[in-house]
Amino acid sequence: MRVGLKHAQSTDVTRKTRKRCLSAATLAIMLFCILSTGMGSSRTDSGEYKLDKELFRRFGRDFKGVFSSPCHWGKKDALTVAAISGVGLLLYSFDGDINSWVQGRRTPSSDDVASVFSYVGNGGVLVGLAGVMYAVGAIDHKESWRKTALLSVESLVTASILVWGTKVIVGRARPDTNESSHTFDSFSFDSGYQSFPSGHAAGVFAVATTIAEQSDVLAVDIIAYSLATLASLSRIHDNRHWASDVFIGSALGYFIGKKISDLNRPGAKNTVSLGFDFSHGRQALTLSIRF
């Protein structure tokens, strides 16, 4: 009995050690991603993008810009939304099968890895890392770092607000409630019925997109989007979200991060043009994104 208990305790310690190592490595990569964002920037410090009153005015302006974007969409934008919705509906029809396949292949090791990446997508972690970047930018007088930090938080907050409202309105049951993927309880404040869309996916993609948009380093873009993808997929693995929840949440986060970044570029326009362009003479489909 004691031998079995010691073995169990030893296994638990090993798993915790492995998880700590994975967490440390992941956070180190994320920190590299953030601190590398301002590399190569030749802009001087104009004194903008600081923790002052302008921060709140800018947030209000940008939130309005994101929220009102659909009012400025045209036919091409409708095609883009239709394409994303189509993929989402396709995943929705297979959500139950995907969930069963993933859950049937979970292992203690995959649980450890998924828990690390799920931690990466936590809002508090993302805000904390943005805070580190802002502090470095403030100390070293790097406006690009401060800008990326503040826009990252702005994108995260905007995504969180829009996602929470959608979650409550839709009221989709989470996989771990043992309800089917077609179970809904609209206007529910029960966390078990706030599966769609994934808040983790929306938040981490909003931040990753902001970092990528401000970065001049390709490696940073790759790392940011890779971490965002793994963090999002971990929610399917952990049985907290259906595949369609994660896909739509990721798309929402991406476009929010993209929109807010472009609203804060010199000479940026406040309208968005997203669409599919069909080439002449063939059925080629091209995604065009214009801000």
Positions of PLM-derived features:
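Alpha-helical transmembrane segments
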Residues: V81-S85
